[in-house]
């Protein structure tokens, strides 16, 4: 039933209960409301698409492991809806990393970066670090392990300038940069 507010205007609400099977089957729902049949307002509700994330590991290049701290990163992109969980481990022991707020991309998926700041000495002695990512809506769960290996050089795809691996919006002095406005350099957040 309609309820009159203090401003003498009436408001009304309606709830449509839908089974999970119908929710997954139908792409959108429409609602019409109004006082006159000729003057109805319509709203359209789209069911959210479910998309698994892509995960890319970011490790410090040789140029960036001379400072006291190193930054390991995990770029998580292309997921929907915005419901992501990230955890870090060092040789199976929980570590405290940072997960930045997700940003919506033009294709209506999301992306974020998680990073872990570690002492460079721990990286150089070969401790294994793992970024674990889960996305409950898609039942996705995966992990990427990172470990320093002396003398190993990263390989770039043919035609990519140095310092641009993996292929993304990079300049040679940045470890990683996206529209998330995050730049990691010399083991610090800038």
From Swiss-Prot:
Cystine bridges: 74-131
Pfam families (alphabetical): C1-set (PF07654)
Compartments, as annotated in UniProt: Secreted
All copies of domain Ig-like C1-type, residue ranges: 53-145
Record keyword Ribonucleoprotein present: no
Domain of life, source organism: Eukaryota
Keywords assigned by UniProt, alphabetized: Adaptive immunity, Disulfide bond, Glycoprotein, Immunity, Immunoglobulin, Immunoglobulin domain, Secreted
GO BP term, example: adaptive immune response
Gene Ontology terms: cellular component: extracellular region; immunoglobulin complex
Membrane-spanning intervals of the chain: none
Residues listed as glycosylation sites in the UniProt record: 54, 179
PANTHER family: TAPASIN
Name under which the protein is recorded: Pancreatic IgW, short secretory form
């Amino acid at each position: 039933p309609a309820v009159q507010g203090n401003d003498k205007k009436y408001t009304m609400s309606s709830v449509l209960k839908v089974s999970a099977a119908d929710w997954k089957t139908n792409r959108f729902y429409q609602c019409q409301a109004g006082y006159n049949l000729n003057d109805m307002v319509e709203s359209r509700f789209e069911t959210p698409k479910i998309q698994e994330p892509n995960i890319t590991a970011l490790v410090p290049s040789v140029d960036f492991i001379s400072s006291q701290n190193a930054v390991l990163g995990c770029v998580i992109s292309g997921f929907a809806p915005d419901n992501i969980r990230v955890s870090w481990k060092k040789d199976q022991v929980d570590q405290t990393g940072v997960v930045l707020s997700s940003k919506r991309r033009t294709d209506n998926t999301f992306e974020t970066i998680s990073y872990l700041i570690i002492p460079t000495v721990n990286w150089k002695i070969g401790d294994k670090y793992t970024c674990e990512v889960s996305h409950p809506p898609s039942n996705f769960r995966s992990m990427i392990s990172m470990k320093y290996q002396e003398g190993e050089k990263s390989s770039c795809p043919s035609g990519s300038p140095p310092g641009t691996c993996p292929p993304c919006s990079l300049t040679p002095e940045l470890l990683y940069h996206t529209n998330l406005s995050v730049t990691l350099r010399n083991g610090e957040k800038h």
